[in-house]
Design a protein with these regions (language model features):
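Lumenal/extracellular ectodomains and adaptor appendage modules
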Residues: 17-226
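Hydrophobic secretory-pathway targeting helix
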Residues: 1-27
Length: 227
């Protein structure tokens, strides 16, 4: 009897606990449709919009790295651009949270959702699809010490809005890391260092002038013998 109870508890633990459902979003907030066999990440300082190609799936799971409240506004559209209904819930498996999207029938099209953003982006692909990372407008990864890309992309291009796009083909099991910054950040830093240098020169000049003035005053006093 105890063995059966332990087995039941183990099965529940492995299958996960289902949390309340997540409200779906509006497809108009995303740059849909996506691209076949591709996952696209539109980076932003406050959020990341993800568009993932799904082929003939009754359900799909997405790992949630942060709190469960950070998985927001999920939508699904088919290849014809029609909005597809789905149930979205949060499940916990082996102490890890996943967003579970369940469709009424096998679905092919694009799933989009929003997750937290920032100037540092990390993603570990688990399949062999193409990964596209789109930086915000007027941002880049090009300046050493301020930005970096790991591993080296297979292609770097720009879209019609001038946004930088990083592309990895067959990126399975390659941890992708991107840090980006504003295009004018190096110039701003140059101005800052220049201002600090000018201030340092002013302080040095004032110090040198004060020392010289005191030295002359001492030499003048030494010319007159003490009585």
């Amino acid at each position: 009897m105890k063995f059966v109870l332990v087995l039941i508890l183990l099965l529940v633990f492995l299958q996960g606990c289902i949390s309340p459902t997540v409200k779906t979003g509006d497809p108009s907030r995303y740059e849909l449709p996506g691209i076949a066999n591709t996952t696209i990440f539109y980076l932003n300082l406050s959020s990341v919009q993800v568009i993932n190609n799904v082929v003939d799936r009754a359900s799909v799971d997405y790992k949630i790295e942060d709190s469960i409240q950070t998985f927001r506004f999920p939508v699904a559209i088919d290849y014809s651009g029609n909005n597809v209904s789905m149930n979205v819930s949060i499940i916990s498996i082996m102490a890890k949270n996943y967003a579970h999207l369940n469709f009424t029938a096998n679905f092919s099209g694009f799933v989009a959702f929003t997750m937290p953003g920032g100037q540092d982006f990390t993603y570990f692909p688990t399949d062999n699809s193409t990964i596209r990372v789109v930086l915000p407008e007027n941002f880049t990864t090009a300046t050493i010490f301020l930005g970096y890309i790991q591993p080296k992309p297979d292609n770097i291009t720009k879209d019609s809005s001038g946004r930088e796009i990083l592309v990895w083909n067959n990126a399975q099991n390659k941890k992708i890391k991107v840090r980006y910054h504003q295009n004018d950040t190096p110039v701003m830093l140059l101005y800052l260092f220049g201002s600090l240098l000018v201030c340092a020169l002013i302080v040095w000049g004032y110090y040198h002038y004060s020392i010289s003035a005191l030295k002359k005053k001492r030499e003048t006093l030494e010319k007159f013998p003490r009585k």
